[in-house]
Amino acid sequence: MLLTKDGTTRSALVVGANATWLERHAADELTRYLHAISGAEIPVTENPPAKGTLVAIGRAETNPLIADAIRTNHLTLSETYPGRDGFLIETITLDGREVLVLGGSTDRGTLYAAYALLEEVLGVGFFRDGERIPNAPTIRLPELHLTERPYFAEREDGNGCFYHYSASAWDWEDWKREFDWKAKRRVNIVWPLNVGGGIMGAILHEWGVLPQPPPPPKEPSLHERVFEYTHKLGMRIPCILPSGSSMPEAFYKAFPNCRTLLMQWSELAPYRQLHPADALFRRLIVDYVRHYRARWGTDHLYIAEFASESRVLEGAEDVQEVRLDFARAMSDALKEADPQAVWVPSSWSFDLSADDPGNPWQANWTVEEVREYLDAISLPLVVWDLWSEEAEKYLRTDYFYGHPWGFGVLHSFGAGSYLHGDVRGLINRVHRLINEPKAKNCDLFLTQEEIVHYNGFFFELCAQLSWNPIPVTFERYLATYCRRRYGAEAGKSLEPAWRHLVDTVYGPESGTVKIILDPLYWFRPDLELLHGWPEDAERSKALWARRPAFVPRLRSAVEIFLSQPDLLRTNEMARRDLVDIASQWISERFSLALIRARDAFLGQDAGAFEDAAKVCLRLLDEKTRLLASWPPYRLDRKVERERKNWGDDASRATKHTHVWVTYEEDQHSVPLRDYYRMDLDGLVADYYKPRVAAYLDLLRRKLASGETKVSAEEFDALYTPIEEGFIAAPVRSLPEGEDPVAIVRELIAAGPDDTA
């Protein structure tokens, strides 16, 4: 079946006169990519031409060609077959004409069929950080009979934190690229966009609290444009409901007798919110949903959390009773406002850690309290278990006691930009899940990363698992990933590099948010050099002791990439992968050198200390140089993009978020310090390195005087001025324009790794 020959068209894409927007979008996407592959301009038409191959896109209800094929028993396609968002790619002969059918049980399925043809048959590689388009002036298809149906009916991607950690300065093209990628990865639920900002003002005006708000702008905001585009792509968007916090003082003057709770998040300033047992709380939710539905419609999914990550300071003697008040009041309000409402409570609120009076976050839950809370919700619900791959709350709550739920992979927290994640472990965990009878009510897979555009190898795996985990094996995934990303020949050559990574940083001893094995320069150095959860300290020590074995494997991975000069010259994604792997190789060596310096200090070995200290500072310089050569890893570039949000304050605001998470100068909380740590050239050069250098100088002075102890107060006095100075100083532009591949070759040629 010929689609193109020598760069000229031999086919036409046929849609019905009543084709939906999404079906026409599928046709437009297909003709765009076929042109990129072959150079041919393939027309999209409602009237099949007399000659050439026909590509029929849609369903029987919208495309007469497909209806004829079904009526004459050439094809089976309906809402129930393949079913869900399933699709088929089928070559048939209809009335003597060669016809390729791309159809779905839903409109989304039809779009997935078009992308599957491109990716699975024609060799296009779709990735978050780029695409690989093969060159084929002649496109000849074999006989095709492909049918796919998702295992999980719902597939969500997105987390509210990524708006802060990744998307704060995105423009329309950035957002469109992100949601097009989600469509290619068959996502059908996304995290809410920021479109409800004017609703509270309108409600409080109706309640007589505030004057009438100004009319909304005539032009839609960026998030409103993205919202509309996302809906066109067939993705559902939940509505985030207010908790009754952030009310103006005028509200409390108008309703002086309303019940409130005094809350606190981390160590920041306490705030008030409506008590869920107060009648105004239910009224607020009903009115909010009414306004939201009038403006945006509804997908009937509602996110509502009580005190997620916050503590109740005043207003409730029994926290569990307030939680139950919240469950009951929210249920009643949603049933009144939207009879088809589905509540999606998040397990993130269910902190099942051992109770700790010093916990700066919410009061902890027991599994019995979780059950009582879920049972108090009196409308349909689906628990979003946001951290299934590590926290395993679904196991501790006996699969949420029979309630519908979704398996969520969080993986990358705000600091999740380094290479990490247990690839084989995730595959095995999901396979155990789908073979467990108790998990029968899990029909949702969530990918809940806080930061995107890092660890693509891990998140592409999540996308495959979310569609259908049954055929996914590590070997099959690795081969597919490399072939699509680099091409068949180069991909096969690079598989050994990724095996090195999966045996190390993407293996069972990879770091997590609990067992932190991040680059040690990201934190204030001390004499412990352990930054994970205290209960995991012994395991962290054991893992650090085995970390030297990672270094030669990472070096080998770098060398394998360097053995592909033609690919590195033509494939930007391969260059980016080389930068990331080389960066990790440097980070691992730094962490080991810092541990050696600390050990030498404690052992009063001045010579060994100086040797390790020199390695630490040299590696940070090498890291800075490499990062500066890759534009997305430059701090000055990030600051420049943030100017549209912060104007002349962009440098301070951007740096402040990396130190304290928040933008505001007066909002500092010790548990949040360095949470948004990452590798940007200016962060390493002007924040992390000065802090490491000060640490080494302090230990050097102590060593000279025979001391082996440093108090927390001494460290704080040392680091606070560095942090404050970094935030206050204008962003510095480091040298740019170097070839990252040449830098990595130079670093490899410099000699063996210093890990002893």
Q: Which ranges hold each PLM region?
A:
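Ordered core of a single globular domain
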Residues: 571-624, 692, 696-725
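Short acidic, S/G/P-rich loop/turn micro-motifs used as interaction or catalytic elements
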Residues: 18-21, 61-65, 164-165, 310-312, ...
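N-terminal small/glycine-rich loop or linker at the start of catalytic domains
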Residues: 144-166, 263-270
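Solvent-exposed, acidic/flexible segments
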Residues: 19-27, 107, 168-175, 216-223, ...
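Contiguous, structured surface segment used for ligand recognition
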Residues: 1-150
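Catalytic-core regions of glycoside hydrolase
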Residues: 42-43, 51, 131-139, 161-162, ...
